[in-house]
Amino acid sequence: MSIVIPNKDSLAVLRQCVDSILDKSTYDAYEIVIVENNSTEVETFAYYEEVAKDSRVRCVFFDGPFNFSKIINQGVEAAKGEYCILLNNDTEVITPDWIETMLGLCARQDVGAVGVKLYYPDDTIQHAGIGIAPSVAACLHQSLPRSDAGYFALNDAQQDLSASPLHA
C-alpha cells in the first residue's frame, strides 16, 4: 500500500497529515510517498529530511510548473505498493482502520476506485462521493453535520457511487 501526498510549502498541514497516518493507522504495511513540488521554504526541506528517517516515508521531487495530475502521476510511478491512496496534504486521519476498510472494498471485483468521507474542521461533510445524473454531477451530503444521518441514513452508509473527488 502506497500513500501518495503532493506538497508545496505547506509544512503545518503536511506534518499533521503524515503524523496522523503514522500515529493513528492500525494497518502497518504501507509507505508514504511525498511528492515535492517547487517548495522554497527551508523548513519544508528540513522536515523532509527529518520524516524520511522513518523507513515508511520518502520524498520524490517533481520539477516543473504546477500540474496536479502530473504530480500525482509521478508519485504513483514512484510508489511500490500494489494499491495507491491519493491523499491531499491537508487531510488528517481520524479513523484508525481507514486503510483496512478501503482495502476491503478494493478487493471486490466490481470496484475500480474507493473514496472516503472527508470532514471540514467544524465537523461538517466536505465530500462523501459524487452522484452523477444525466445533466449534473454533485458532491453528496456536502455541509451536513457529521451527526446528521441524512435521507434514509445515507450519510452513515457505505455507498456505490459514480465518482470520488480529488482536489488540488
Annotated model-derived regions:
Residues E36-Y47, G64, E92:
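A conserved acidic beta->alpha catalytic loop
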Residues D19-A29:
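Short, acidic, metal-binding catalytic loop of nucleotide-sugar glycosyltransferases
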Residues A29-N38, V60-F62:
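Short beta-strand/loop segment that forms part of the nucleotide-sugar
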Residues C84:
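Short aromatic/hydrophobic "clamp" motif used to bind/position activated sugar donors
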Residues N67-K70, E77, G131-A168:
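A recurrent flexible, glycine/aromatic-enriched loop bordering the glycosyltransferase active site
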Residues T91-S135:
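Conserved donor NDP-sugar-binding/catalytic core segment of glycosyltransferases
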Residues Y48-K70, A78:
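Conserved donor nucleotide-binding strand/loop of the catalytic core
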Residues M1-V4, E31:
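Cell-envelope/extracellular polymer assembly enzymes that use nucleotide-activated donors
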